[in-house]
Amino acid sequence: MEKIGGVFDEYVIILCYDDSRDNTLKILTDYVNKNSRFRLLINTTLVESSCRTHKIANARNHCLKHMQEYFSNYKYFIMMDCDDVCASPVNLEVLKNNMKRTDWDGLSFNSSRPYYDLWALSMKHLVYSCWHFSQPNTHQIYKDAIQHLFRTCPPGELVSVYSAFNGFAIYRTHKFINSCYDGQSRLDLIPPFLMEQNKRICGEITPYYWGGPDQDCEHRSFHLRAIFNNDAIVAISPEVLF
């Protein structure tokens, strides 16, 4: 995170902590004491839900609210997962070069291993959750579709999508500052004609494949709101960042 922050003239790192059964909080607190750029938010407004995406959306919104209140004048903000997906060496030149472009407002990246984040992905003809259609066919359809888009993307161009994350994304603040994350299935945010295209390819919508209460990837609502409210342009760079 600090290496990425060094690309900018000024930066802060905002992390939201809610609960754990290990020494995560101590590790984070020790780091705060060593780095004045680090903002640790202790989230006391936990959601009463067993759904993972509902909890993650709550934490991401907590970070977003802090940014809205204190750093809304920043030109960019980054949402980044803290797992092994972003643990590989980062290619800062890829980030720097893409920041010179003007054809995106929200940008994520390809990865060195097969593209994993299919749940956050909304493509032009496959806009809804890959886990809300019959399996295993739909998961493979989405996997094949994104790989086809990468293969056929002209050199130097970006892949246009409605939503994508893949562990890391950078946003132009003024286009996403008033959006928010939602881990619920927000079919009301998807235009009917796009939903019909999706169903023609994958069949009718089914209950959430992994069982339990219904949920959807929180990134989809975040991106769709910005697209339809602020004309945001969401894209994926075929280049590998991590």
Summary of predicted features, one role per range:
Residues E218-F222:
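Short active-site alpha-helical segment characteristic of glycosyltransferases
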Residues H174, N198-P213, N229-F242:
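Active-site donor/metal-binding and catalytic loop motifs
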Residues K3, C16-I27, T45-E48:
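A conserved acidic beta->alpha catalytic loop
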Residues D84-G203:
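Conserved catalytic core of nucleotide-sugar-dependent glycosyltransferases
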Residues M1-E10:
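Short, acidic, metal-binding catalytic loop of nucleotide-sugar glycosyltransferases
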Residues T29-N58, H62-K65, E69:
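Conserved donor nucleotide-binding strand/loop of the catalytic core
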Residues N43, L107-N110, S237:
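Short glycine/serine/threonine-enriched helix-capping/active-site loop
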Residues K65, F71-A87:
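Short beta-strand-to-loop acidic/aromatic patch adjacent to the donor-nucleotide binding site
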